[in-house]
Amino acid sequence: MIIRTKAYPRVGLVGNPSDGYFGKTISFAFSNFRTEAVLYETPELEILGSEKDHSRFENIWHLANDVELHGYYGGIRLLKATVKRFYDYCREKQIELHKKNFTIRYDSNIPHGVGLAGSSAIITACLRALMMFYEVSIAKYTQANLVLSAEVDELHIAAGLQDRVIQVYEGIVYMDFSKDIITRQRYGHYESLNPRLLPPLYVAYRDDLSEPTEVFHNNIRDRFERGDREVTNAMRYWAGLTDKVKCCLVKGQTEKIGELLNANFDQRRKIYRLGEENLKMVEAARSAGASAKFTGSGGAIVGTYQDQQMLKQLKKALCKLNIKLIKPKIASSKGKGRV
């Protein structure tokens, strides 16, 4: 029996730049890239890495370049953390697991380090494979919580629920993480929206920017927990923008969404320390008439465009900066794996 499961990158369309601040956000998953987990029964339990987890290099320069691109941590730690958290969950819920062992490996072509949630995609795909292998059914909102727990509790990575929710639910989802909701039920209010409501969107990225998200968000987290008024006001502002974008989608007023996305980024720029190269991406897109904001922690942007002529101008402006542009295909498949 061979189990194959996939998970997809996500775009934070509007709302909080992260998601652990009791705010609101709209995100979507898209299938232009993917992470795949492959699991099959074996005599012993073994976790295999991908090409990014290799430990053999051509020379010292190759090693240094690999570390600069991918850091010191590959995907094996993510798989181990997921298996451990899945086991703990089943033990807590008194779910008896069969005694068979397995080998699991993953492969991902999601651009690394550009704010598309590639790490949580690995965990999500792994969790889906484990659920199929052990025939354990877990509610979607709990799956998202488990993915988050694998990162936060097991690996001590600063993270919130947004990425994990959209990668579990897929499609496009409105999320409300208001404190009263989170306190009452330990997860947010999640509402799937019709992808057909979206205006024409683009995603653009480059793979030589940004830094790990767990580093990027630390300063804002500290300020938020201290009650910094500038940060708390920004979180409320982003939550309000999220409701406005949702209203525009439902009413078919998509021509108004671009300016709201721009406002989302402009507010972010006021409280975050943003790298010059990241800013150039946004400015280049806006120079072509498109809207632009980060998809996540930096390195990739998302925005709206009016027509094919504007898209052509957008591609031209971004190409000058060696930035790749795609039209995202919304991931909304119901099948999570194949045996």
Can you name each region flagged by the protein language model?
Residues 135-140, 251-255:
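Short, charged, surface-exposed loops that flank catalytic or proteolytic processing sites
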Residues 1-12, 18-20, 27-31, 35-98, ...:
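C-terminal nucleotide
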Residues 116-138:
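DPxDG-like acidic metal-binding loop motif
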